[in-house]
């Protein structure tokens, strides 16, 4: 995930055709998709999980993610799953001998807020970005399902999101335990 996310990032300034412009940043992820699709055929679902917002200075935003989503839908991906944050760019420096951990900075909080959240949330922190990205995909003429994840606190909220057309699928695990 992190390697391809690095290529998609607005911070990717590679000058070898795999960065700088949106087309350049999309090049490797689309090449990977084409290779996977070529191996598994059309009767196997292939999609992509990517960041709706990197939540770092100069990083990709929801507007960027909407353009990425449309490109992925155009390429034929079967679903688009959205997350956010969790970047090493703003993580705290590890102590000597310890591994770097991406969930210690502001973008980490956006990805894994349970470390400092409480009964007030944040709940459904990816709903608005996912809905905006889904709307962009639909406006471009694609019906590619969009998966919302992140802070969905239960089945009632998940059902409401589907009923309201804010997402096509809801991904959560911990909440169902």
Segments the model singles out, each with a brief description of its role:
Residues 1-177:
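Flavin-dependent oxidoreductase catalytic cores
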């Amino acid at each position: 995930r992190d390697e391809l996310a690095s290529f998609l990032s607005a911070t990717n300034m590679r000058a070898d055709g795999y960065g700088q412009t949106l087309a350049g940043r999309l090049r490797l992820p689309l090449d990977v998709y084409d290779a996977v699709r070529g191996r598994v055929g059309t009767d196997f679902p292939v999609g992509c999980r990517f960041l709706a917002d990197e939540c770092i200075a100069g990083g990709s935003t929801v507007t960027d993610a909407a353009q990425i989503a449309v490109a992925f839908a155009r390429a034929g991906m079967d679903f688009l799953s959205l997350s956010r944050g969790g970047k090493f760019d703003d993580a705290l420096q590890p102590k000597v001998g310890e591994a770097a951990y991406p969930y210690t900075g502001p973008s980490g909080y956006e990805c894994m807020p349970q470390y400092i959240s409480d009964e007030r949330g944040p709940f459904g922190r990816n709903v608005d970005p996912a809905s905006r990205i889904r709307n962009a995909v639909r406006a471009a003429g694609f019906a590619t399902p969009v998966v919302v994840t992140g802070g969905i606190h239960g089945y009632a909220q998940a059902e409401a999101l589907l009923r309201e057309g804010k997402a096509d699928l809801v991904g959560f695990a911990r909440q169902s335990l």
